[in-house]
Amino acid sequence: MIKFITQFLFVGFIALGANAWADDTVRDAAISAVVTDQIDAFSKDDSERAFSHASPMVKASIRSHERFLTMVKNAYGMIYRPSSHELQEVRMIEDKLYQVVLFIDQDRNRFKIFYQMQKQANGEWKINGVTTFTAKNDVFA
């Protein structure tokens, strides 16, 4: 009987772990889709679509999709018109989720961008800001 209970608990823990992994996979795919769509929107100068992925805090501070596009053009050229980009992992840092993306700009400079993601009450993921790092040693596949 004890062996059965132990096996039952073991199988239950494995199932819980598999469910958590599956939930993370679904979450990460949703986050990646948001970031990818915003990058695509920038490539087409679709400021409304790009701005639609911004969190309420970002929208409140910038106030319009036109201003948002201008800000990205001027401050984040590597995101606005990258030579290439590659989505990396989704990371949890201090209870916040980040989509990591490697970018190469038009001058061949490399950047690692951390997109801070924020889950909304309706379940959608929004971008709550980015943090940029120079990524001299990162290699693109």
Task: Go through each PLM region and give its residues.
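N-terminal secretory signal peptides that target proteins for export/translocation
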Residues: 1-2
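Bacterial N-terminal signal peptides
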Residues: 7-17
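Cleaved targeting-peptide boundary
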Residues: 20-32
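Exposed beta-sheet edge and beta->alpha loop/turn motif
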Residues: 89-141
